[in-house]
Swiss-Prot record:
Involved in the catabolism of purine nucleotides. Can use allantoate as substrate, but not Nalpha-carbamoyl-L-Asp, Nalpha-carbamoyl-L-Ala or Nalpha-carbamoyl-Gly. The sequential activity of AAH, UGLYAH and UAH allows a complete purine breakdown without the intermediate generation of urea. Involved in the regulation of seed maturation and seed dormancy. This is Allantoate deiminase. Disruption phenotype: No visible phenotype under normal growth conditions, but mutant plants are unable to grow on a medium containing allantoin as the sole nitrogen source and accumulate allantoate. Partial defect in seed maturation and increased seed dormancy. Mn(2+) 2 binds at residues 178, 215, 499. Mn(2+) 1 binds at residues 167, 178, 281. Induction: Up-regulated in imbibed dormant seeds. Glycans are attached at residue 156. Its cofactor is Mn(2+). The gene is AAH. Residues 56-78 are annotated as: Disordered. Its EC number is 3.5.3.9. SUPFAM superfamilies: Bacterial exopeptidase dimerisation domain, Zn-dependent exopeptidases. It comes from Arabidopsis thaliana (Mouse-ear cress). GO terms for biological process: purine nucleobase catabolic process; ureide catabolic process. It is found in: Endoplasmic reticulum.
Amino acid sequence: MAVPHPSSSSSRSHPFLSHVYHTSFHHHHHHNHPSLVLFWCLVFSLLSPLALSSSSSSSSSSSDSSSSSSSHISLGIGETEGTKHDLHQAILRDEAVARLHELGQVSDAATHLERTFMSPASIRAIPLIRGWMEDAGLSTWVDYMGNVHGRVEPKNGSSQALLIGSHMDTVIDAGKYDGSLGIISAISALKVLKIDGRLGELKRPVEVIAFSDEEGVRFQSTFLGSAALAGIMPVSRLEVTDKSGISVQDALKENSIDITDENLMQLKYDPASVWGYVEVHIEQGPVLEWVGYPLGVVKGIAGQTRLKVTVKGSQGHAGTVPMSMRQDPMTGAAELIVLLESVCKNPKDYLSCNVQCNEDTVESLANSLVCTVGEISTWPSASNVIPGQVTFTVDLRTIDDVGRKAILHDLSTRMYQICDKRSLLCSIERKHDADAVMSDPQLSLQLKSAAQSALKKMTGEVQDEVPVLMSGAGHDAMAMAHLTKVGMLFVRCRGGISHSPAEHVLDDDVGAAGLAILEFLESQM
């Protein structure tokens, strides 16, 4: 188990009266005055049957306005479930949305959202998240990597814990849902169980984790938080430095977290103590919006390869070298990039597989392969000079590792052939390789059932099958898969936009995510 860090205790909002009536969330943060409507709900819930009868009699002679107000607060026979539904919705949707907005204001920049590993904003976010965890009845601590934990132990049951998490760091000029939604929806679901007096009914410990670093912006090293808990972070990673020459270890020590080689190793969770890991995350793509569904289950996270391609030719004067005599690396690079696009759009037309590459691999590539050239540079980069060298990057992702390796082999062969034909020198350097991570089938089925049940409760109708899709983006689940089985739930985002201030999730979809996690937790009782 991770060693708690002795940080100062955070202030707690009231566990029940913290913004549970939806109209209050449009104008206030979570720490403002509680709804008077809920106050009267509590008063009436404690009244005797005689008082309830008197209230009912009084309401019959009240004005239309009073009658409308009374319909929100009455807890008479037959109305308890409706009131509970409103309360749950207020926590899972309205309060969660308010908290997303509040956390989205915790930034290192005045003009945009920026919260990187161990920055001042990330330190300010820690007590805020801890306070929300404590509000949900969780015991909290901060570990030696700056991860924030909130845990509840069952009265009886298994010692193997269910971990639910996502990251609290952001990219530069970020949206407020990436990472934060997964943390807040889990906290909200557990708060509902606390309000209902059911936390103790869980059959295993549940631990919510807000990982300190997933994006890797500051140190160009992703998954610092989750990799430490999964036991896959090398000690040497502590010495990696940012642009200012500050190391990971220094950044932690500057914030009174005394990380050492020894206690980094102590952060690793014992696999026998963990039942599984679940992560809620915005899709960061357009599929759910396109199919018109708020939630989807992730079947796996794509494997990824990053290449650096360098093409060298003959540098010369733009006006004096005839076209037929040029060895132009720019036009050569352009042909390579067009080849990449063709291969990734129609992999079966280019793939020359060995016996390992079967029909399933070809189909998987056709459905999941994506390729991107994200950077390109020339030397000497002058308008009147034929370049001497062009360098570009390739990001290639697919759910099928066998297919990814086969495509890379065939792509490289064809690239070298094009360079030879053009009398150019070509080098292909592999900069990063990560295998795909598959979600646990049984855990995915449970999440799918929970999502289906949540959406049925929200709409009152039986919904179509919950979509199952691949994640092209990396997530903390990739690191946690080295520790335990993993499952992920995607939430629809507008236009598929992420890593942008235009990133947006509908309030009802925020509520759907929280309700799905609540349904999943109830299946763990």
